[in-house]
Curated annotation (Swiss-Prot):
Its EC number is 2.7.11.5, 3.1.3.-. It holds the Pfam family AceK_regulatory. It catalyses: L-seryl-[isocitrate dehydrogenase] + ATP = O-phospho-L-seryl-[isocitrate dehydrogenase] + ADP + H(+). It is found in: Cytoplasm. This is Isocitrate dehydrogenase kinase/phosphatase. The gene is aceK. GO terms for biological process: glucose metabolic process; glyoxylate cycle; tricarboxylic acid cycle. It comes from the Bacteria. Bifunctional enzyme which can phosphorylate or dephosphorylate isocitrate dehydrogenase (IDH) on a specific serine residue. This is a regulatory mechanism which enables bacteria to bypass the Krebs cycle via the glyoxylate shunt in response to the source of carbon. When bacteria are grown on glucose, IDH is fully active and unphosphorylated, but when grown on acetate or ethanol, the activity of IDH declines drastically concomitant with its phosphorylation. It comes from Burkholderia vietnamiensis (strain G4 / LMG 22486) (Burkholderia cepacia (strain R1808)).
Amino acid sequence: MNHFPKLLSSQIGFDIAQTMLEYFDRHYRIFREAAVEAKTLYERGDWHGLQRLARERITSYDERVKECVELLEDEYDAENIDDEVWQQIKLHYIGLLTSHRQPECAETFFNSVCCKILHRSYFNNDFIFVRPAISTEYLENDEPAAKPTYRAYYPGTDGLAATLERIVTNFQLEPPFEDLTRDIGCVMQAIDDEFGQFDAAPDFQIHVLSSLFFRNKSAYIIGRIINADRVLPFAMPIRHVRAGVLAVDTVLLRRELLQVIFSFSHSYFLVDMGVPSAYVDFLCTIMPGKPKAEIYTSVGLQKQGKNLFYRDLLHHLSHSSDRFIIAPGIKGLVMLVFTLPSFPYVFKIIKDHFPPPKETTRAQIMEKYQLVKRHDRLGRMADTLEYSSVALPLSRLDHALVRELEKEVPSLLEHEDDNLVIEHLYIERRMTPLNLYLQNGSDADIEHGVKEYGNAVKELMKANIFPGDMLYKNFGVTRHGRVVFYDYDEIEYLTDCNVRRVPAPRNEEDELSGEPWYTVGPHDIFPETYGPFLLGDPRVRTVFMKHHADFFDPALWQASKDKLLQGELPDFYPYDTSLRFCVRYAARFDATPDHDDGAGAAQRAA
């Protein structure tokens, strides 16, 4: 601080700081209550209730910020508080956080409230938390001993099998397990398959996070195995095999598999964390290299993730010298996309005007992005970070990019000193555009990319998402090889679409016409017409028809729509189904033919 006050004399400053913290505490109490409710809904198998809960939790933070801002404006005339008082508000707030269990999240909440009240010229060290003020190192839960951040187990005492069984039963899930002894046998077999002979060191132990991670129809046990100098991550998803009966579905023992389930293309977990920083630190030990911003986001604290990401960006800018450039690939009609080559993200801005045939508005596009934020993304739609008033140094912007910005989004630009301030943008993980991946790839790459593309669209379809624009350029390939959709301006709910077959041509003139001879409503979709846009490359066509010949059959799309209208929620797995115990160790399940969510026979046949 430029002028640290010798005395904190402002009673209003203290009252405002206390009010802001009370609203944050209310927010975090609701956040934790949602995770507790998730356990109850999971135990009941109430999947629609879990979806509703996840949607409501996403909007809860902004609702608390709005309530806090309104109170501060009504009772304290916050917009007209002078600088000295704002400085004291922050210092009082820091004092209130000294024994807090979520100080980093509380600081972010403070920033959110301030940014609604103050002009951005006040976004400096004196008034908001540009850097954290309270350390989260060694922060631990002061709740009863039964609820530490993680529990330690020592298999050397009772043996590994008994320890694994105790790990599962300690979560006290209400429904019974179909055959927990069988499931633990599968876990033991998977460990043996992965690591072979396992020589236990004197410090051999297993650490397990104390709360389950809920998402979709799974509850994940997350932990790590410590053996000498090795730290081995694991995740055990537990699922309902039928109503009211549970089973361990698999155990994931590779770091890359955990990185996928915590990926930016999945919805946020519901997890009860007394000390979120301790959970994030634990997860960093099993996924080293994964940014803390992404981990905070994946556990449902997306505002904290957004805050950390922006700090990461500023830090990267101060330690790099390359320039922002227009993103490679085909330019979009709706979004201007640019990137910093040394930073693995893209920046997307809605253009001021859209050429035909696009018929949409900025507000409609922003609502589409909100739809994706609220929806279950299933590992097939990229999460986005939304920012306002982003200041980038002009010296770091390529001249061609500046010209493009001034041409396409002049209404969103403001020059301020040596910075260009962009009023609104989205930031996403950078991926390889699927069209470039297929264009430049080997035969094996094409096989993988096309198979993944078809799987992605079919999974989105089952999740009630119609992408709208199916072109390959609107999909990307992640570093883990998954195909993910990222162009949302034409996205619709499949249940809002009319799936139609192309009517037979009435005559030869119709047949030769380059235009439809039939009426097309605003929500009509014609799967039979997608072929010319997707199958132009002979290599792609061969692979596509091998794996996804049914893609162009309206019956496939209509069947998914019908199931959705009947309230059916399909099963999704953020890992290859070949890893599921009922598939991988099918012989162990011969005595339980009803296992596997009612789809076991199909999975095993596959």
